[in-house]
C-alpha cells in the first residue's frame, strides 16, 4: 500500500498540512540535487549519422520511463567524448525531457556506454543524503510535478522548461524509509508489467 499523498501509479497533492506530518517536507528542486547538466547539440561540435553509438533527444524518452532507441540518430566515439564532457551521464542519473511533453524521464540503471544525450535532455544527479534517485524519477513523472513544472514553460511552438525554473519547483519529500517503500512498490509494478509484456510477446 502506498503512503498518504500517493495514488497507485500517480502522485497526488492532498494538502500541505497532511503531507508535512510524520517527517514529510517540501523542498525546492535545487535543494535535492548535486548537479544538473545538459547534453550537446551538433552545431559545429560534431555531426550526426556517423558511428554506431546512439544520440538521445527528448523525443526518445517515453512516458513509461524507458528510452526508445528505435528512433534515434547515431554518433561516433569522438562525438560521444565531446558530448560526455558536458553531460557526464552515469548510473543513478535521471534523464528528464526539458521539452514538451514535460515529464518524460528515465533512471539510468546500467552504464550508458553506447549512448549520450542532446541539449533537450537534462541529466540530474541527486543528493542521496536527501532523496533517492528512484523516488525523484517517479515524482518527476507524476501529474502533480508535471503540472507545477509546466506553469513555467516557455515557447509558443515548442514548450520548454528553463533550468532556473526547474530548480525553483517544489518537491514533496517523504522520509527516506518511505521513499524506499514507494520506489519498491513501483519496481514491483514495473517487473509485473515487464513479465506480462514478455509473456504476450511469446504468445
How would you label these PLM feature ranges?
Residues 62-75, 94-97, 101-118, 134, ...:
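Short, ligand-facing micro-motifs at secondary-structure edges
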Residues 83-84, 110, 156:
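A structural connector/turn signal
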Residues 141-144, 150, 170-172:
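Well-ordered mid-protein domain cores that form the structural environment of catalytic cofactors
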Residues 27-46, 59-91:
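Sequence-specific dsDNA recognition surfaces
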Residues 84-97, 136-138:
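Polybasic, glycine- and aromatic-enriched phosphate-binding surface used to engage nucleic acids
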Residues 111, 125-132:
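Ligand-binding loop in jelly-roll beta-barrel domains
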Residues 98, 114-122, 134, 154-183:
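A short glycine-rich beta-alpha junction/loop motif
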Amino acid at each position: 500500500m502506498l503512503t498518504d499523498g500517493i495514488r497507485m501509479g500517480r502522485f497526488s497533492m492532498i494538502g500541505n498540512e497532511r503531507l508535512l506530518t510524520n517527517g514529510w517536507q517540501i523542498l525546492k528542486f535545487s535543494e535535492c540535487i548535486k548537479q544538473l547538466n545538459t547534453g550537446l547539440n551538433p552545431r559545429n561540435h560534431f555531426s550526426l549519422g556517423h558511428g554506431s553509438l546512439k544520440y538521445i533527444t527528448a523525443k526518445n524518452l517515453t512516458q513509461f520511463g524507458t528510452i526508445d532507441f528505435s528512433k534515434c540518430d547515431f554518433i561516433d566515439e569522438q562525438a560521444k567524448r565531446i558530448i560526455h564532457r558536458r553531460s557526464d551521464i552515469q548510473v543513478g542519473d535521471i534523464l528528464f525531457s526539458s521539452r514538451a511533453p514535460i515529464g518524460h524521464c528515465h533512471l539510468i540503471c546500467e552504464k550508458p556506454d553506447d549512448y549520450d544525450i542532446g541539449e533537450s535532455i537534462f541529466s540530474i544527479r541527486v543528493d542521496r543524503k536527501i532523496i533517492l534517485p528512484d523516488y525523484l524519477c517517479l515524482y518527476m513523472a507524476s501529474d502533480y510535478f508535471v503540472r507545477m513544472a509546466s506553469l513555467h514553460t516557455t515557447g509558443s511552438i515548442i514548450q520548454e522548461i528553463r533550468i532556473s525554473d526547474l530548480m525553483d519547483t517544489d518537491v514533496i519529500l517523504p522520509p527516506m524509509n518511505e521513499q524506499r517503500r514507494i520506489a519498491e512498490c513501483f519496481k514491483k509494478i514495473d517487473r509485473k508489467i515487464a513479465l506480462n509484456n514478455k509473456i504476450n510477446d511469446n504468445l
